[in-house]
Every structure is written in C-alpha cells, then in structure tokens.
Amino acid sequence: MEVLIAGVLLTAVLTAVARFSTLAMAGSNHQKDRQAIEASINDNIQLIQQADSQITVNRLLDDNDGFFDTSNLVQACGSGSPSSNAASFLMTQISNGEVSVAPPELSTTQTDYSLQRNFSIINLGSTYMLKVEYQFEGPEENVDTEYRVIEISPSFEAGCYQ
C-alpha cells in the first residue's frame, strides 16, 4: 500500500515538472521569436536612417557624382504641399528610389507574424515628416497586433530653406 501511494505521489510530481518544463520551453520560443522580430525592425530602422543620411544637399546639387543625377534639390524639396515635399521625396527614395530599403523579413521565426511596414506623411503645419510604422502579431498568447513607429525629418530638408 505504501509503495502504491509513493508511486502516485511520484507520478504527480513528475507530471507537474513536465508541465512546467513544457511551459518554460514554449515561453522560450516566444521570447526568441520576439527578439527576432524586434531585431529585424531595429535593423530596418537603422537602414532607413542610413538612407536618409545619404541624401545630402551636396549630392542633390551635383548632377555628375552618380547619386541622384535624375533629381535635384528643387525636386527633392518639392513645393511644400502635402503631395510634394521633402518627406514625400524621402519616402519615394526609401520605397523604390536610389537608396531603397527593403521591408524587414523574419527568416528565423517558426511562425509567420505578418510583419508589415507602412509609410505616411505627417503634416506639421509648415513642414512634413515621414512616419514609418511597423505592424506585427505578438508571439505571446493573448497579445494582439503591436506597432513600432518612428518619425523622420529628412536630413537634407534644411537645404530647402536656403
């Protein structure tokens, strides 16, 4: 009888340990996926900032340097309207221009978290900024859509007012 009780207790303890181990491993996978998502977004943000810093007033003014030879500073600055401004030029260049940056990809995650990148222009009255929004499904349970947002003022925009 004592052996039977000891066996039942041992089974209960081992079952509990197995459950905790399973939950810990699942949590670890979610953490790895979250780290991969955040790293992918951070890498993409750095590439966008690098692309912005490559668009300079000097490069826009020089038609023979191999950079932005089909664009000039006047075109880059635009007319200051919602559809023609420095931020929209930056958005076009990052999307499919000479300094284009591909959307982030998740190659190391085991699940598709539908990571998306969207651009929009923010009107600040006399100037405009580029808003870059990343959207993805959180890897943890009970976590819905998450967003990461950055706002960029084009680095060459100061040259538009000279």
Task: Name each region found by the language model.
Residues M1-I45:
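Aliphatic-rich helix starts adjacent to a transmembrane/signal segment
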Residues N42-Q162:
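Low-complexity, Gly/Pro-rich coil/beta segments used as flexible assembly/activation regions
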